């Protein structure tokens, strides 16, 4: 379960940003998770709540959005976007030999601070 490690790293960054802004509390966090990152949203939510206990982010509202993966199709010679790691076929030519170009893992998109 790498969700715990991702949650810990995200919290470190969130706390740094909150302290730099002089915030007393983090009330909301918006995360974007790559489609092929193998991150389970429910596990990430559980782990994030766990690591936030006793911190500025305890009790904050967590919002998770999934990001499409950008892939290159050699057969079509074009970029395609895929939402699920379970469907790795080009929507134009049905090629299953796609090269993943961008799937940005986990990104902190926005923080809500008090």
UniProtKB/Swiss-Prot annotation:
HAMAP family: HypA_HybF. NCBIfam families: hypA, PRK03681.1, PRK12380.1. Disulfide bonds: none annotated. One of its GO terms (biological process) is protein modification process. It comes from Klebsiella pneumoniae subsp. pneumoniae (strain ATCC 700721 / MGH 78578). Keywords: Metal-binding, Nickel, Zinc. This is Hydrogenase maturation factor HypA. Ni(2+) binds at residue 2. GO terms for molecular function: nickel cation binding; zinc ion binding. Zn(2+) binds at residues 73, 76, 90, 93. Belongs to the HypA/HybF family. It comes from the Bacteria. InterPro entries: Hydgase_Ni_incorp_HypA/HybF_CS, HypA/HybF. Involved in the maturation of [NiFe] hydrogenases. Required for nickel insertion into the metal center of the hydrogenase.
């Amino acid at each position: 379960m790498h969700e715990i490690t991702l949650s810990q790293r995200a919290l470190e960054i969130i706390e740094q940003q909150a302290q730099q802004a002089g915030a007393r509390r983090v009330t909301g966090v918006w995360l974007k998770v790559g489609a092929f990152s193998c991150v389970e949203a429910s596990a990430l939510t559980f782990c994030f709540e766990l690591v936030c206990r006793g911190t500025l982010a305890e009790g904050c509202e967590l919002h998770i959005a999934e990001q499409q993966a950008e892939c290159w199709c050699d057969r079509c010679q074009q970029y395609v976007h895929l939402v699920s790691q379970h469907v790795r076929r080009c929507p134009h030519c049905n090629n299953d030999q796609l090269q993943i170009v961008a799937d940005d893992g986990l990104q902190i998109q926005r923080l809500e601070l008090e």
